[in-house]
């Protein structure tokens, strides 16, 4: 299954009971695409694995033991300074975007840090882990980008964090079946395609083509645009 916005949202809901309220007791960076955060919560220990590899990005709990470098990389040291001994107060996604946010509060070993957040962007080769303060000012990031490398935002220490640009619609806030169909119809005409897998994956956040194909197969409708098909897809997606 592709790691799309729906998967990211579901994983956040599964992780929350395990790690919200937990105390950060270790942070490691076994390689330049991965951070592992040790969490103690409800008399249990958890290892939160955050991977930003372009072809296998994910957030999950792990029991795998990784070999860590003798000397911790700079970003790992920054995370330890700001997050060790704090507690996780919240974990959530931004709608169905592939962005997960973890909030921390408390005292680190060196100072009263107040509130901090890590923003996990799971977007292929652009995947990143960004540490920000309570005002969303970037403290540090696993990967840095300046205006020369990225025309619309900088990921460097001291700059204000801004969300990645997205032209897609928010599927969660969609309420009207007629508007849903009209949006799909307009896209179909503009890009000359009637395949729902193409239309939904390019028009709305959260959908991968793999997920759409599974959905269509589950509700026994074919992969083409019609008002009946979009109505059934929307009703199934929002059912309790």
Specify the residue positions occupied by each region the protein language model found.
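Intrinsically disordered, low-complexity boundary segments flanking structured domains
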Residues: 10-15, 36, 74-78
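Residue-level recognition of beta-strand termini and adjacent short loop/turns
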Residues: 31-33, 95-96
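Amphipathic, interaction-prone secondary-structure segments
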Residues: 34-41
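Short Lys/Arg-enriched alpha/beta "domain-start" segment
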Residues: 2-15, 66
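Phosphate/anion-contacting hairpin/loop surfaces
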Residues: 3, 43-240
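Glycine-centered C-terminal helix-capping/turn motifs at helix ends
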Residues: 20-21, 85
